[in-house]
Amino acid sequence: DNVPWGLARISHRTTGATSYVYDDSAGEGTCSYIIDTGIY
């Protein structure tokens, strides 16, 4: 995998990683609320 360094960094404890590991069940059973004021 050739992912951006930020994704690789949060996916591994050690530095220098170039892959991203994602758990398929991550986020399961959660709710998200998005509030947008429309002002920018």
Swiss-Prot record:
Keyword check for Chloroplast: no
pH dependence: Optimum pH is 8.0. Retains over 50% of its activity after treatment for 20 minutes between pH 7.0 and 11.0. Inactivated by treatment at pH 13.0 and at pH values less than 5.0.
Biological processes annotated in GO: proteolysis
Domain Peptidase S8 positions: 4-40
UniProt keyword Protease present: yes
Regulation: Strongly inhibited by antipain and PMSF. Inhibited by benzamidine and aprotinin by 80% and 17% respectively.
Matches recorded under InterPro entries: Peptidase_S8/S53_dom_sf
Active site per database record: 36 (charge relay system)
Root EC class: hydrolase
Source species, domain of life: Eukaryota
EC nos: 3.4.21.-
Temperature dependence: Optimum temperature is 55 degrees Celsius. Stable from 25 to 40 degrees Celsius. Activity is reduced considerably by incubation above 40 degrees Celsius for 20 min.
An MF annotation (GO) of this entry: serine-type endopeptidase activity
Keywords carried by this UniProt record: Hydrolase, Protease, Prothrombin activator, Serine protease
Primary role: Subtilisin-like serine protease. Cleaves prothrombin at 155-Arg-|-Ser-156, 45-Thr-|-Ala-46 and 316-Tyr-|-Ile-317 to produce meizothrombin(desF1)-like molecules. Degrades fibrinogen. Inhibits plasma coagulation.
Subunit structure: Homodimer.
Similarity field: Belongs to the peptidase S8 family.
The protein's name in its UniProt record: Subtilisin-like serine protease AS-E1
Species lineage: Eukaryota, Fungi, Dikarya, Ascomycota, Pezizomycotina
